[in-house]
From Swiss-Prot:
Record remark on domains: IleRS has two distinct active sites: one for aminoacylation and one for editing. The misactivated valine is translocated from the active site to the editing site, which sterically excludes the correctly activated isoleucine. The single editing site contains two valyl binding pockets, one specific for each substrate (Val-AMP or Val-tRNA(Ile)).
The protein's Enzyme Commission number: 6.1.1.5
Gene coding for it: ileS2
Role noted for this protein: Catalyzes the attachment of isoleucine to tRNA(Ile). As IleRS can inadvertently accommodate and process structurally similar amino acids such as valine, to avoid such errors it has two additional distinct tRNA(Ile)-dependent editing activities. One activity is designated as 'pretransfer' editing and involves the hydrolysis of activated Val-AMP. The other activity is designated 'posttransfer' editing and involves deacylation of mischarged Val-tRNA(Ile).
Short motif ('HIGH' region): ranges: 47-57
Keyword Protein biosynthesis: yes
Descriptive protein name: Isoleucine--tRNA ligase 2
Pfam family, any one: DUF5915
BP GO annotations: isoleucyl-tRNA aminoacylation
Length: 1033
């Protein structure tokens, strides 16, 4: 075995391992070795390479890698095809910024073809950084043969899906109100909108709509979007709701009966009550009357009107609201549009022409106030949708869009979702299920440039539609010969014209591109260019056994995968979904570059290593919970877990090499109870870890491993050190080497999916082979000893209590104490005699015994809890307090046992005192201190005799010299001669403990003499000792 370089950094170790993986093609071998095995199917959600990775990507990549590595080691064949999401607005916006242009008009002036070329060039801006990040974090995925959404084969598969959907009659062109981003100048789908809600404060207005031909009668309508008022064409009431006419300050207002108090507040008089249906068709004067409205400005009925907020009357602007649009269509009212594609008012609103509508709420309200049409205004906090790409507030516009009739097969969506196992489980019928229940038809088209072109050609004469399902299909119907290298992007496909099979006229492609979420949702099919090739491979790789992404993908990729597959095949595309929580800063705030609280995962790997970052992300909390995260979290993972494991591994290699121990040779071994215990712990942990991993409970698995590593380091190795330090190779020492070797090799396999670099380093050095080509550990039932584990757990509890006891009383473990008494509160069959030496040695006590009668070593003190007893006992509280103080210890003991006592205040007058009225304090026998955990109480004799004090000094001296040896980098097995120069009292103490010193410090000869200032000095409290070490002769 190679010597472990303890000075090598984690980053250095990981770079070395990466180099070895690449040189030996370990990733490729891990897949090839499973050829013919059952497939475990994994889908990679495609990131975009025109932005840099963040900590959330580190979490996602870690989880996906853990799954793939574990399943591979568990015997499955796991293909891992990378992917790139390359279309969409972020790319366009980046190119616009690069070119110094803005908006569709300037793009078209620049030229669609050169703009598309720039988009294609920019999509892999950060590919090199993504590749380096992916490799540095240890995520094994095939980045040399990825699926790329901009490539013709991928787009052709998407066209086949869309063509099939069109063939089924589920793709249609419709006129409806859709969410619209005025900055990007395109509509969005409902699942895109769901990703961008923000809590904002907007100006709301309660508006006076004057009843036509009345003197002073007004309908009151409330709106949170004053900018829509110029497009008002009607007011809606609920036909079955009650409304009142109420007089206030000379005006009569019509408002819902349930809302009158909230709206009018005070000083009003209800004149009459009316059903909503009585108000229908009453005309009013619009605040912004438009001559284009030839049928409108009247009250209509609508079921969506409620009395939950506002006035119970809804202002209707059909161009900017889905409900508004539907009710106006059914009533046959006029339609009014006063906003252009940039979100600015048109000449229809002259005094605001050219202004962005969301900036005009104040102008509108001022106008209303000037015209005496404003009843009330206030800031209103509500959740408002923003563009998930550019962060601009969205508007709702009526216009033409291409839609997929997802609502027609809603039952298929719901049934398919019912077959999926969600982590966490509540997502199935909660966040995701509710979204499916309320879904609307998918707005698939985008009025942009860089994306998969919508493959629908329309006849200019008869409106017939043709949706080619392949390039060959398009060529077959093309009016002219199409280039062999036809690129399936704008403007190239726009140049292809098709002859209408119905009337013989020319058909042109509809100009839109499609929603990028349809691109990524098509990846199970398009990544293999299905159905044009790789049919067997596709069938083997569909559906996915598991997918894992952030919770924000609930209405993104998780939805689009489910939707595309249901529309195309009717089948569900995945069996399990891991919905990962957000990674927040240490204050619980969302990380953001603008806030300055974002952590760069590349920097974290560079500082602490990928293993530490991965472990920190895994062990902190359940993966679906939001987690607070900081550099300190990663540093703690490194020091507590990775470094602890490396220290154990380094210790083993150091001593095994010194003793020339060879794990491949056969030795006479005699296992101790400690060996049997650690092997049982190893295999019971293996059992728990496998169970947790099979159920995707990665945090539980990681915590089990962390507990095991801690116990191996701080209990097994520490308790076994004397065996390793012995000279020669006896049977117990050979057993210690054999056991620790087996433990380390098995742990390296257990942690291989979690921390692949340190796992590889340990396994490679101990066995000569890559851990990632091994099988995952299986439980050896014959090594399980539950009783032994329970006993050792009890010992560990007692030792921990003893240490805590010492800390509370500032008694260092180096200071011997006379006695430890263990009080057992529950009888059990624990054989403490077998563990006597361990407890005494760990807690440095001279005697140890177990006592069942705790009254021998403890007593109780009762103090009245005046806070509770005062109100209960009133004037008698002081008398009760005095009575408590004079109780005998037997009476106190009886009170503690029965939890009640009766105090006779006066003849015939009794008070019942319970443990709720009293503070019960357990007090140790004089000279003893106690610590308890409910199961056990540890009593330590704290009287330190002169003899014990001197031994404590000697042990403290041993510690100081051991540290000094480390500073000198002396070999651990080097025997030395020691010369000391110190005061006479310390000389005598050390002389009295000469054997103890020689045994623990590998000292052949101790002498005392005069040393100069040039010699080194040690500090033992306030005492100084000069020391000189030399190699023993």
């Amino acid at each position: 075995m190679k010597k472990v370089d303890v000075k090598e950094s984690a980053v250095g170790r990981e770079m070395r391992i990466r180099k070895q993986w690449n040189e030996q093609n370990i990733f490729e071998q891990s897949i090839q070795n499973r050829e013919g095995a059952q497939s475990f199917v994994f889908y990679e959600g495609p990131p975009t390479a025109n932005g840099l990775p963040h900590v959330g990507h580190a979490l996602g990549r870690t989880i996906k890698d853990v799954v793939a590595r574990y399943k591979t080691m568990a015997g499955y064949k796991v293909l891992r095809k990378a992917g790139w999401d390359t279309h969409g607005l972020p790319v366009e916006l980046g190119v616009e910024k690069q070119l110094g242009i803005s908006g569709k008009h300037e793009i078209e002036e620049y030229g669609i073809e050169p703009f598309i070329k720039k988009c294609k060039e920019s999509v892999f801006t950060y590919e090199k950084q993504w590749r380096e990040f992916t490799e540095s974090i240890g995520y094994w995925v095939d980045m040399d043969d990825p699926y790329v959404t901009l490539e013709n084969p991928y787009i052709e598969s998407v066209w086949h899906i869309l063509g099939t959907i069109h063939e089924k009659g589920l793709l249609y062109k419709g006129h409806r109100v859709s969410p619209y981003c005025p900055s990007c100048q395109t509509s969005l789908s409902s699942h895109e909108v769901a990703q961008g809600y923000k809590t904002v404060k907007d100006l709301s207005a309660t508006v006076k709509f004057k009843v036509k031909d009345s003197e002073n009668e007004y309908f009151l309508g409330w709106t949170t979007t004053p900018w829509t008022l110029p497009a008002n064409v009607a007011l809606a009431v609920h036909p079955n709701m009650e409304y009142v006419k109420a007089k206030q300050e000379g005006h009569v207002y019509i408002v819902a009966k349930e809302r009158v108090q909230d709206v009018l507040k005070e000083n009003y008089e209800v004149l009459s009550v009316h059903k909503g249906e009585e108000l229908l068709n009453i005309s009013y004067t619009a605040p912004f009357p438009m001559k284009e409205v030839t049928n409108g400005y009247r009250v209509i009925g609508a079921d969506f009107v409620t009395a939950d907020s506002g006035t119970g009357l809804v202002h209707i602007a059909p161009a900017y609201g889905e409900d508004d649009y539907r009710v106006v269509q059914s009533e046959g009212l006029s339609f009014l549009h006063v906003v252009d594609e940039k979100g600015e008012y048109t000449e229809a609103v002259p005094f605001l022409k050219g202004k962005f509508v969301k900036d005009c709420d104040v102008d509108i309200v001022r106008y209303l106030a000037k015209e005496d049409l404003l009843y009330h205004k206030e800031k209103y906090e509500h959740s408002y949708p923003h563009c998930w790409r550019c962060d601009s507030p969205l508007l709702y516009y009526a216009g033409e869009s291409w839609l997929i009739r997802t609502t027609a097969i809603k039952d298929t969506f719901l049934q398919n979702n019912d077959t999926v196992t969600w982590y966490p489980d509540h997502m199935k019928h909660g966040r995701f299920g509710k979204f499916l229940e309320n879904m609307v038809d998918w707005n698939i088209s985008r009025n942009r440039y860089w994306g998969t072109p919508l493959n629908v050609w329309e006849c200019e004469r008869c409106d017939h539609q043709f949706a080619p399902k392949s390039i060959a299909d398009l060529r077959k119907h093309s009016m002219k010969e199409t280039p062999e290298d036809l690129e399936l992007h704008k403007p190239y496909v726009d140049e292809v014209q098709v002859c209408c099979e119905k009337c013989g006229s020319t058909m042109n492609r509809t100009p839109e591109v499609i929603d990028v979420w349809f691109d990524s949702g098509s990846m199970p099919f398009a990544q293999y260019h299905y159905p044009f090739e790789n049919k067997e491979l596709f069938e083997e790789q569909f559906p996915a056994d598991v997918i894992a992404e952030g919770i924000d993908q609930t209405r993104g990729w998780f939805y689009s995968l489910l939707a595309v597959s249901a529309l195309y095949t009717g089948k569900v595309p995945y069996k399990r979904v891991l919905s990962l929580g957000h990674v927040l800063d240490e204050e619980g705030q969302k990380m953001s570059k603008s806030k300055g609280n974002a952590l760069d995962p590349v920097d974290l790997v560079g500082k602490f290593g990928a293993d530490a970052l991965r472990w920190a992300l895994l062990v902190d909390s359940a993966l679906w919970n939001a987690k607070r995260f900081s550099e300190r979290t990663v540093l703690e993972a490194k020091s507590k877990f990775v470094d602890t494991l490396v220290n154990v591994y380094s210790f083993y290699v150091l001593y095994a090499n010194l003793d020339e121990y060879n794990p491949n040779e056969t030795y006479d071994v005699k296992r101790t109870k400690l060996d049997e215990w650690v092997l049982s712990r190893l295999h019971s942990t293996t059992k728990k870890v496998r169970t947790a991993l099979d159920d995707y409970q990665f945090t539980n698995a990681a915590r089990e491993i962390a507990a095991l590593v801690d116990e191996v380091s701080n209990w097994y190795v520490r308790r076994s050190r004397n065996r390793f330090w012995e000279s020669g190779m006896n049977a117990e020492k050979a057993a210690a080497y054999e056991t620790l070797h087996d433990v380390l090799v098995t742990i390296s396999k257990l942690i291989a999916p979690f921390t692949p670099f340190v796992a590889e380093d340990v396994h490679l050095n101990l066995t000569g082979s890559s851990v990632h080509l091994e099988d995952y550990p299986v439980v050896n039932e014959s090594l399980l000893q539950p009783k032994l584990e329970a006993e050792m757990d009890a010992v560990l509890q007692v030792v921990e209590l003893g240490r805590s006891n010492r800390n509370q009383h500032s008694l260092k473990v180096k200071q011997p104490l006379a006695e430890l008494v263990l009080l057992e509160h529950n009888e059990n069959d624990m054989d403490w005699e077998s563990y006597r030496d361990i407890v005494m040695d760990e807690l440095n006590v001279k005697a140890f015994h177990v006592e069942l009668d705790e009254t021998k070593y403890t007593s109780y003190q009762l103090k009245l809890n005046f806070k509770k007893a005062g109100p209960k006992f009133g004037k008698n509280v002081n008398a009760v307090n005095g009575w408590l103080k004079q109780l005998s210890q037997d009476e106190v003991q009886n009170f503690v046992s029965t939890e009640r006592a009766v105090y006779e205040v006066a003849p015939g007058e009794e008070i019942v005192v319970t443990t709720e009225d009293v503070l019960v304090e357990k007090v140790a026998k004089s000279g003893f201190s106690n610590t308890t955990n409910g199961q056990y109480t540890v009593m330590l004799d704290t009287n330190v005799t002169e003899e014990l004090l001197q031994e404590g000094v000697a042990r403290e001296f041993i510690r100081a010299v051991q540290e000094y040896r480390k500073q000198l980098n002396l070999p651990v097995n080097l025997r030395v001669d020691v010369i000391l120069d110190t005061e006479e009292e310390l000389q005598q103490t050390l002389t009295n403990h000469k054997e103890l010193l020689e045994e623990n410090l590998l000292v052949k000869q101790f002498t005392f003499g005069h040393l100069t200032n040039e010699d080194d000095e040690l500090s033992l409290g306030e005492t100084k000792v000069r020391i000189k070490l030399s190699t023993a002769q």
